[in-house]
Regions:
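Glycine-rich, mobile lid/loop segments that gate access to catalytic sites or pores
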Residues: 2-58, 65-120
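Exposed boundary/loop context
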Residues: 1, 60-61, 72, 147, ...
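Glycine-rich anion/phosphate-binding loop at the beta-strand->alpha-helix junction
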Residues: 98-205
Length: 205
């Protein structure tokens, strides 16, 4: 039964156990190894867009960019670096207006062996999406080139294969035909703005 005063199973109360489970999983991965006995690099995640403003801090797998740098390093829609605006200012403005912001988080699994997943119903993408959508506020997910692939030609989207047998560009995001291909598994998750805000809105009592 949904409590009319707010909260319920979509509030932060039940997001916390998911976070706790993720912490345990990351600790378990720290002791794991790949097929060639190489250590598994921790799953990485970073904010790539906040309030419609994209980050211009790009490093492979999210390494080498601190949270402070990300907050100060953004770009406008035209791709030019903004000098007088940053994510903190956007956050402060939203708070001042009693509003909230959406965001896009990019997640990368740098070290994952090929062969995980299944074609069709149990593809690695569908299993990841199934888990991700358990997080309240998630409204979308894309892998690799994602929706941008719809604007590409086949020659642009196809992944060239390097001498090591792995994709060079990784436009597929680490999976082909529902099965991991040995490249980093990369996906982005869209979060809606929090619906609980101070700003007056039309409603029905």
């Amino acid at each position: 039964c949904q409590d009319p005063r707010g909260g319920g199973h979509f509030s932060g109360r039940l997001t916390l156990p998911i976070v706790a489970a993720g912490v345990v999983a990351k600790k378990m991965l720290a002791d794991a190894t790949m097929l060639d006995d190489a250590p598994v690099t921790a799953v990485q995640a970073r904010i790539v867009e906040l309030g419609g403003i994209a980050s211009c801090c790009h490093s492979e797998g999210g390494e080498g960019v601190s949270d402070g740098q990300i907050l100060q390093c953004i770009q406008n829609d035209n791709g030019s670096e903004a000098n007088n605006e940053n994510w903190q200012a956007v956050i402060d403005q939203a708070i001042k207006e009693g509003d909230s912001l959406g965001a896009i988080i990019e997640c990368t699994v740098p070290d994952i062996d090929p062969g995980y997943g299944e074609p069709f119903w149990d593809s690695v993408e569908s299993l990841v999406a199934h888990a991700v959508f358990a997080i309240p506020g998630v409204r979308g997910i894309e892998f690799g080139d994602g929706f941008q692939a719809a604007r590409m030609k086949g020659s642009e989207h196809n992944d060239p294969i390097g001498e090591d047998g792995r994709p060079v560009k990784n436009g597929a995001g680490g999976a082909n035909g529902g099965i991991t291909n040995g490249a980093p598994l990369t996906f982005r998750v869209a979060f809606k703005p929090t619906s609980s805000i101070r700003k007056a809105q039309q409603t029905f009592n």
